[in-house]
Amino acid sequence: MRLFLIRHAHAESGEPDESRRLSPEGREQARALGKRLADEGVRPDAVLTSPLLRARQTGDALAEVLACTSEPSDALAPGASAATVQSAIEGRGETVIVIGHQPDCGQIAAELGDGTEPRFPPAGMVELHLPGPGTS
C-alpha cells in the first residue's frame, strides 16, 4: 500500500482549535500539493482527513484537484497514532492519502517508516510503502 501522510495546510490563528480555517496561503498550499500529486500520477483510492476543519479543507482541496472525494475520520483527530491510522486505512485500497496534524504526523511516519521522524511543515508530506495483505 502507498500511504501519503500529509499535515494540513497553513491555518489561520485566533479561533478555537476545532474551528481554525485554512488561510489564503493554506488554500494555495493545498491546491499546489494536489496538483503535484496529480502531475506525479497519484490516483488515490481514498482521501481520509482529521475531522477538524483545517484538515477537512485541505482534503477537499486535494480531492478537487485529484477528482475524488475526501472523508473525515474521527480516528485521525489530534492524538492519532500509527495504530489508529492503520485501522482507518484498512481495506481502503492500494493508494491512500491521510491528512492529520503535528506532532502526530511525524510520530506516525517514524513508526510506520524507518524510525526517523520527518519534519512536517504545513502541507508537508511523506510517502510510505506499507505491506499489504499476505506480504511482510
How would you describe each model-predicted region?
Residues R2-D74, G79-A82, G115-F120:
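Active-site-proximal alpha-helix that buttresses catalytic centers in soluble enzyme cores
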Residues L3, R92-G100, D104:
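Generic beta-sheet signal
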Residues E40-R43, E90-E94:
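Glycine-rich phosphate-binding loop signature in dinucleotide/nucleotide-binding domains
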Residues P51, G100-Q102, G124:
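Short secondary-structure boundary segments
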Residues R54, D104-C105:
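Alpha-helix capping/helix-boundary segments
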Residues V85-S87:
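Conserved ATP-dependent adenylate/AMP-binding module captured primarily in the ANL superfamily
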Residues C105-I108, G115:
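Conserved beta-loop-beta/alpha segment of the NTase-like Rossmann-fold superfamily
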Residues G115-S136:
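Domain-level recognition of soluble alpha/beta enzyme cores
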